[in-house]
Every structure is written in C-alpha cells, then in structure tokens.
C-alpha cells in the first residue's frame, strides 16, 4: 500500500485541523484498495464556537453522500461530542432517532447528515479517526478462521470487534467492550467482515497507521500466495449483450445501462469452474448490498432463464428475512458473472453502472484472495438483509425524486452537421440518456462501427439520430438503418429520429421511406420522428405521437 503523505503539502495545513482532515481524507479516498464510491469515513475533534461564541467540543465527521476522494470542508458535519457520548450510553436507539438526534446536535444546520458511524467516531478518544473497508483486511476476515488470522498477524496491536450492524449497534458494542480499555495501547481496530479503524492525535500518524496495517495484511496475503487472480480471454457478441440488457430492462421496468468488464481478470474469474458458487455467497461488505444487492446473477448460455431464476430467488430471500412494513425492492440483479465474457454491471445511468462495476471487480478479487486462505465466508444473508433493508434506506424509497425523462436510454447520434450533433448530445445527456456521437461528414462509412461501439459501451441502442434522406435511395439511412436495426429491435421504446434542414414535403417523403423500410423489415413497432433542424415541421409515427413529440422537443429545439 503506497504511503501518499507529502510533508511539503501537509505543511500548508499544519495549523488548520479541518483542512488537514480534508487532506488526509483525500489521501485515503485516492486508494481504491481502501474505499470505493462513498465508502469509509473520517473525523477530527476540535473546539468550535457555537452561535453565541461559546467554545464547544466538536466532532467534524464525514457527511452522508460525500466521497473521501473529493471531499471538501463542507462535506464534514459538525456535531457536539457531549451529545454523541450520551447517545452511546443509551440501551437502544432507532436509526431515525439517531439521525434526528445527530441533526439536533449539529452546530450548522446547513451541513449534510453525519455518517451513521458518528457516535463511534466520538467515543474513540483521539483527535483524528480514519475508517476504511480495506480489501486486504476483508480478505482475511471473510474466511473460516478470520478471527484467528487477524490475531495471528496483529497480536495485541489492534482491538478486534465481531460483526454487528453498522450504526448505533456497532457504536454501542465498541463502547461496551472498550470503556475500560487503554486506547493508547492500540494502533487500530479491526471490525470483522466490515473494515478497519486507525486513530491518533496526530493526523499523519493516524493515516500512516492505516497504510502500515493494511500493508501488513497485503504482505500476509502475499506470503500465503493469495494475491494472484485468475486471468482469461473471451469475447462478447454485441447482439447477445443487447439482448441481455433488454431482458434486465424489461424485468426492472425501466431502461438500464449495461457495462461489460471484459478485462483478463474479469474473464478469468468468470471462467473459474466454481465461479457460480463462490461468486454468489455474499457481498464483500454488507453496505455493498445497497448498491449491488446481496449477490450477482450467474449467467448461463440461456441468460433469460438465469435472470428469471435470480428474480425468483431474490423474492424468496426477501420472504425469508422480511418483517412487517418493509417494501420489497425490485428483484433485478445489479451485476452478473458471465463465463467467456467477464463481469457485467447494470445501472440507471453510466455512472451508476460504473460504481456497481467497481464493486464487482473488487469483490471478485477479494473472493479469490479469501479462497486461497482456505475459503471465502461472507456474512450470512440475514445480516446482509438487515443492511440492504435498513430503516434509512427504506425511507428513501418513499421520498425518491423523479427520474430524468430519458434515464437509462442509449442513443447514437450520427449527424453530418457537427453543430446539430453537439446540440442533440447536450440535450439528450441533460435528459438522462447515455450518448455516443459521431459528427464527421463521413458518418455513412462509420455507422456500423459506431453502432457496435455504442452497444459495447452502454449495452444496447434505443435511439438513432441521423440525417434526413433527400433522394430515392434514402441516402445515409441506407447505411445506418440496416446496421442499427438489429439493436433497435432489442432496445427499450426504440425510435429513429431523422433531422435535416429541408422542406416539409422532403421531410414527409423521408418519414414515409423509413416507416416503409421498418414495415418491410417486420419492425413497425419502432418509433419514427422526422423533423427539420428548428423543429418547426415534424412527422411522427401516429402510435407514439405524444411521447415522441416531447422527446424531439428536448433533443432538437434550438
């Protein structure tokens, strides 16, 4: 594990604990082997003035929704430590009450909600506290003899806490087990199946303890020859990828983006004989279930059957673990293990799919580490369910914001007019679509490769935007339609949009040609929109007129 500390840079913050906290937090966030996409949390304890100018012992802890790699001072929530210490002494505390009490303990109401680990940070008696979900630590703890391995490696240098639900339950357990402990005797604290804490009154020491302990864990794995992942080769037919993405979208009820990881490491894992068994035992850490569900789908040659089986098993999982009042989430997988192709992740947009993809990549790597140590043993499903369906996440279901109109849709823009191509791309992206654009004059020569590039990048094709045809051979459309049609057939609410600066009669002629072409191809269900560049004249397939007119306004309005 690389030590990224820079004395010269840190010197600029030596007299400002909050800025120093930002600096060291970003150091941790820059290392994906420590944290991923909002994971982990950090804090600093200092005296701050309240509204009346009174000095108050304050915990500045990472706020919900912030990423350690890019966090700013505004991303830390300031809370009164005396209130947090009182909360730690309670026998019980619901998640909603914990959030409410933490909000009331804030010195700044504009700050984000504090991390659910705020109480735990408060009771650790050091100025700086760092918490990560280090892969090497998880590889050791998620094994049959994880506790013995941690004790063998670290001895009495770390406190070891058995797994318990994150939030108040964890803070309470740590409080009870350590209230008589001499914290100065320890360099860190390992949470089984969860992660690791380090702490110090010195920011550099706390950070370097994290790097040191994780490096020792990596060296332990190296000595056990547990670091080398399987490698493999394979290939994916774009049509089968589009078909898989269509099946997932249909089951989820909304279009999704599919991101295929066909790296040698991803294919190597997918090709393991026991990948379907070890890969579906459980998540790397329980919080990953919020983004990626408890397990992935293992895809057989009949991917549709695999998805149906996954959905049935997910509903059974919910039924086994649910209690009154819970709302079942959709039963669609968030990622999959695909022999011969690699790992595939699904999301409502490219960023969401990439986050899940990163989780999948790190999970499969750690699974192999743990298997080399004697066997991958993640948390039992009831513990994972408790996190996936915990109170705070269920509350979000009831207050979710409306999605962008084209969220999850995938578009290819193949226009010879660069300005119009950029205009369309900007509007489609703003509406939530994943967009690939080619704006060279030679779009006809590039359309075939552009279609495949779009499918391999995002999983399919729903919208083709191309030039209006002005001659009897339907011009550029003669090249673009045959290349795109097999994928549009597998799209979600597929449509073809032709744009051009020409007369109403020319637009109408082009519209009729496209409709006829689709009908002759047996694909009359694909929507057609033909419009001039200022959207003053538009021809739309009658059965989709209302929806398509709104869409075309979004993507062509000048």
Task: Go through each PLM region and give its residues.
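Glycine-rich flexible loops
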Residues: 1-411, 423-427
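Amphipathic alpha-helical dimer-interface segment in Rossmann-like NAD(P)H-dependent oxidoreductases
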Residues: 472-492, 503-521
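Hydrophobic/small residue at the entry helix of a nucleotide-binding pocket
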Residues: 420
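A glycine-rich helix->loop->beta "capping" turn
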Residues: 434, 450-476, 489-494
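Rossmann-fold cofactor-recognition segment
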Residues: 434-446
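Conserved Rossmann-fold SDR core element
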Residues: 432-435, 460, 492-497, 518-556
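Conserved hydrophobic beta-strands of the Rossmann-like cofactor-binding core
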Residues: 410-414, 464-466, 496
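Conserved glycine-rich cofactor-binding loop
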Residues: 417
């Amino acid at each position: 594990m690389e030590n990224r500390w820079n004395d010269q840079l840190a010197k600029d913050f030596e007299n400002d604990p909050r800025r120093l906290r930002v600096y060291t937090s970003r150091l941790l966030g820059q290392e994906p082997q420590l944290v991923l996409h909002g994971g982990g949390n950090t804090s600093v304890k200092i005296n701050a003035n309240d509204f009346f100018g009174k000095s108050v012992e304050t915990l500045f802890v990472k706020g919900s929704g912030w990423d350690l790699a890019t966090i700013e001072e505004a991303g830390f929530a300031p809370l009164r430590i005396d209130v947090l210490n009182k909360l730690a002494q309670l026998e019980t505390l619901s998640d909603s009450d914990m959030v409410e009490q933490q909000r009331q303990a804030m010195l700044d109401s504009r700050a984000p909600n504090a991390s659910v680990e705020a109480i735990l940070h408060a009771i650790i008696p050091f100025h700086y506290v760092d918490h990560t979900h280090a892969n090497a630590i998880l590889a050791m703890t998620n094994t049959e003899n994880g506790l013995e391995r941690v004790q063998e490696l670290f001895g009495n240098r770390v406190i070891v806490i058995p797994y318990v639900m994150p939030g108040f339950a964890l803070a309470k357990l740590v409080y009870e087990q350590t209230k008589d402990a001499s914290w100065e005797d320890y360099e860190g604290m390992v949470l089984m199946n969860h992660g690791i804490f380090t702490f110090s009154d010195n920011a550099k020491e706390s950070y370097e303890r994290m790097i040191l302990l994780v490096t020792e864990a990596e060296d332990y794995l190296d000595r056990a020859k547990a670091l080398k992942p399987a490698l493999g080769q394979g290939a994916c037919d774009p049509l089968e990828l589009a078909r898989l993405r269509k099946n997932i979208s249909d089951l989820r009820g909304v279009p999704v983006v599919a991101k295929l990881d066909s790296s040698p490491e991803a294919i190597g894992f997918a090709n393991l004989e026991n990948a379907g068994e070890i890969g579906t035992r459980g998540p790397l850490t329980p919080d990953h279930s919020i983004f990626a569900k408890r397990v992935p789908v293992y895809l057989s040659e009949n991917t549709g059957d695999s998805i149906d089986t996954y959905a049935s098993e997910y509903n059974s999982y919910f039924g086994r673990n649910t209690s009154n009042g819970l709302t079942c989430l959709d039963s669609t997988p968030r990622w999959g293990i695909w022999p011969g192709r690699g790992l595939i992740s699904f999301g409502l947009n490219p960023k969401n799919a990439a986050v899940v993809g990163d989780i999948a990549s790190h999970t499969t790597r750690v699974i192999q580490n743990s298997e080399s140590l004697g066997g991958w043993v993640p948390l039992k499903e009831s513990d994972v369910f408790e996190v996936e369906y915990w109170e705070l996440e269920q509350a979000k279901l009831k207050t979710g914001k409306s999605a962008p109109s084209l969220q999850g849709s995938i578009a290819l823009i193949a226009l010879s007019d660069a300005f119009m191509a950029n205009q369309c791309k900007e509007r489609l992206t703003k509406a939530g679509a994943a967009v690939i654009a080619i704006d060279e004059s030679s779009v006809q020569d590039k359309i075939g490769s552009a279609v495949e590039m779009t499918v391999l990048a995002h999983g399919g094709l729903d919208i083709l935007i191309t030039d209006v045809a002005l001659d009897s051979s339907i011009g550029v459309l003669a090249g673009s339609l045959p290349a795109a049609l097999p994928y549009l057939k597998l799209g979600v609410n597929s449509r073809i949009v032709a744009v051009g600066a020409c007369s109403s009669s020319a637009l109408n002629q082009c519209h009729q040609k496209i409709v006829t072409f689709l009908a002759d191809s047996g694909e009359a269900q694909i929507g057609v929109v033909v419009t001039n560049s200022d959207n003053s004249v538009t021809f739309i397939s009658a059965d989709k007129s209302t929806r398509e007119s709104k869409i075309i306004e979004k993507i062509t309005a000048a």
